């Protein structure tokens, strides 16, 4: 039954089915080799009636999912990454252990879509480019398949571009270096992306 109005609806998807559906949007093979994506916690066969979407899986978002009656938490950043911090024990005297145990005890599955969603067509960086109003967008050569490049509708001085970024993206803060020239060609990359600065500069961004 539909939880809103009690009317009949189609079959309820399982966590495993939702993982496969999300991988159709952001294929697993687009993820960086060090990344950890997909259904990271939970029962593949668990029926999912309600899901909560968050940037991170934290104690707070896990508690919010439980309170909302959501059986699934879909997040961008991986709840665990064996390349960064291998999980060797599952104990309640570590922050990560407490979080994973909280998810298991609450019956909350966790699907994480990270660099594969950054790189996917229509994913994070395409969304950033659209939000900034970039035109003629393309994947930046040398940008790891993640970074997007495009043109502003018109050239603008750096202060005006910074104001546009503040208005459209509402960041907590902005770090910038004044190159002494107006802005037209822009590269966007969610996350660090520092290793792609040289490629962006070479492309005229």
Residue ranges and their predicted role:
Residues 1-205:
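Hydrophobic structural segments
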């Amino acid at each position: 039954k539909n939880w809103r109005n009690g009317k009949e609806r189609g079959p309820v998807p399982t966590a495993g089915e939702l993982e496969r559906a999300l991988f159709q949007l952001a294929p697993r093979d687009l993820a960086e080799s060090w990344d950890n994506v997909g259904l990271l916690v939970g029962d593949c066969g668990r029926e999912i009636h309600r899901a909560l979407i968050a940037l991170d899986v934290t104690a707070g978002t896990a508690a919010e999912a439980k309170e909302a009656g959501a059986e699934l938490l879909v997040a961008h950043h991986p709840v665990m990454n064996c390349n960064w911090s291998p999980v060797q024990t599952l104990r309640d005297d570590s922050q990560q252990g407490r979080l994973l145990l909280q998810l298991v005890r609450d019956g909350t599955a966790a699907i994480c879509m990270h660099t594969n969603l950054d790189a996917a067509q229509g994913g994070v960086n395409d969304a950033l480019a659209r939000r900034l109003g970039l035109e003629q967008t393309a994947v930046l050569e040398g940008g790891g398949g993640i970074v997007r490049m495009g043109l502003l509708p018109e050239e603008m001085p750096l202060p005006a571009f910074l104001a546009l970024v503040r208005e459209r993206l509402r960041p907590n803060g902005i770090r910038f270096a004044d190159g002494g020239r107006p802005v037209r060609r822009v590269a966007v990359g969610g996350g660090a992306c520092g290793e792609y600065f040289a490629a962006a500069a070479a492309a005229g961004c």
